[in-house]
Amino acid sequence: MNPNARPHIEKILANMTQLPGVYRMLGKDGELLYVGKAKNLKNRVSSYFVKTIEHPKTQALVARIHDIETLVTRSETEALLLEQNLIKQHRPPYNIMLRDDKSYVYIFVSSDKPYPRIASGRGKGKHQIGKFFGPYPSAYSARDTLLVLQKLFNVRQCENSYFAQRKRPCLQYQIKRCSAPCVGLISPEDYKQDVDNSIRFLQGDTKELNQELIAKMEEAAEQLAFEKAMFYRDRLGLLREVQAQQAVFKIKGEADILAIAFQAGVTCVQIMYVRNGRMLGGKSYFPDMLSDDLGQMLSDFIANFYFQVADEVPSELIVNVELPDRKELEQALQTQFDKKIQIKHKVRETRAEWQELAIMNVQHAIKGQLSNHLELNERFHQLEQVVGRPVDRIECFDISHTMGEATIASCVVFDQGGARKRDYRQFGIEDITAGDDYAAMRQALTRRYKKHIVPDLLLIDGGKGQLHMAMEVMQTLGLDAFMVGVSKGEGRKPGLETLHFTDGSKIQLPEDHKALHLIQQVRDEAHRFAITKHRAKRDKRRAGSVLEVIPGLGPKRRRDLLTHFGGIQGVLKASEKELMLVSGLGPSMARTIYKILHE
């Protein structure tokens, strides 16, 4: 406990109620550090200040607490709902469990008539009308399923704007992954059948599809339509190949199976997804927890995950440990998602198979993570020896632009648990001389540390010049930051980097030094993060700049044009009559656009 705050905290604890409710822990400047819920506020909050607390994250939290506020509720369920609402609203740093909190990936079948599209994306976009299937454990697994659907049923996956402006079939048709509805090479009736079959496939109804394909293949063979028979034979082979890879269980229904494991300071939660009796796969999470009790940790994870990250919750959650507040958690989830939800620990038969599979996967995942964890810890340890001070959090900046165009600065964050992707930041750099990397870095550092705490190590991708500029920024902000500049070697060859320190000294580590490997890993991630955003910004700006010279064509109409034709290339290829089809463009403006673009 912070010595300066001890008298105040002890007074608060002495007068605290034993009713259920929510507690908020505040820092020196009143900033919200952590939100928690309790069945008994006095007992729960007091437990943070006992001498036996050993968890590093809890110790770090307690050291920063200067004040505690409480809100009494009528029940523990009400407290849980309020806790999750406050976390969602304020995002306190010590409530952050997941380093990467991307939402679920779904496959989406649109309701566009007469030619729906199939695509994948994160979350159930409320602006989209259609059917969603999933969740899928990763974008890769969703794309893999889409590829199978393309090969089986040839349903389009292109954007509506691209679809609308096609005049001839695209490459997808040439490689037999689309039936080219854009140019009328398939009737709406036949296309609808392909869409319906795609939906049946996504719902797991592959047995009937199998029988239908056999019947069509035999019918085509009897009619001596051998090319058609071969087409159905190939589809049948692909479908059977997919069926062989899928785990399909006898019972239908939906469930998430969650297994937790804790070993050597690493917590892992494995989630397996079952929908319509099909195992869709699973994903491993490595949350930062404040507890060492497996049941409490899994309960906290479930509350955080389904309230803060997931778009849906299935009717069953199967867990591998008993949860201390199972009933309250069920009630809170039912209130949030407006459906009956059961959390089960002791299960039999098929559900026991699911549970066993999740346990096997969590044990495998934690072994792999421990191996990575040990390697990363060793890299951090060797880096600490090189710089002569403790290092837990590293932040690294990089600048990306093309001849001064669309300049982007990136900031990536690593700690001894790995990359903290939810702490990454990107800065669009404006109002500087084109190509001035020093000014770009100055602006990014100022914007980052005007309100944020400096890390244990600030890595600057650049040599002495960039480092001196960073020192000036920190001096202006009145901050004491430990910084190291990283300059590339001859020919920009990896392994020849030089580290520059603020006292003017510099060192070159051996190519196989683990500290150098860590620095390269962080720097390369900063470069990747910057250049990805830069390219997107540059391409968007270039697409718009061609249209900006057209008088009377404002931002909204430019955006409508690009959306309608699927990009600047589509606009350039469009005729006057096609331009007139864009909403809000009359004959005069269409003529002007065409004339200027084709002069």
Swiss-Prot record:
Interacts with UvrB in an incision complex. Belongs to the UvrC family. One of its GO terms (molecular function) is DNA binding. Residues 207-242 form the UVR domain. Residues 18-96 form the GIY-YIG domain. It comes from Acinetobacter baylyi (strain ATCC 33305 / BD413 / ADP1). GO terms for cellular component: cytoplasm; excinuclease repair complex. Keywords: Cytoplasm, DNA damage, DNA excision, DNA repair, Excision nuclease, SOS response. The keyword Phosphoprotein does not apply. This is UvrABC system protein C.
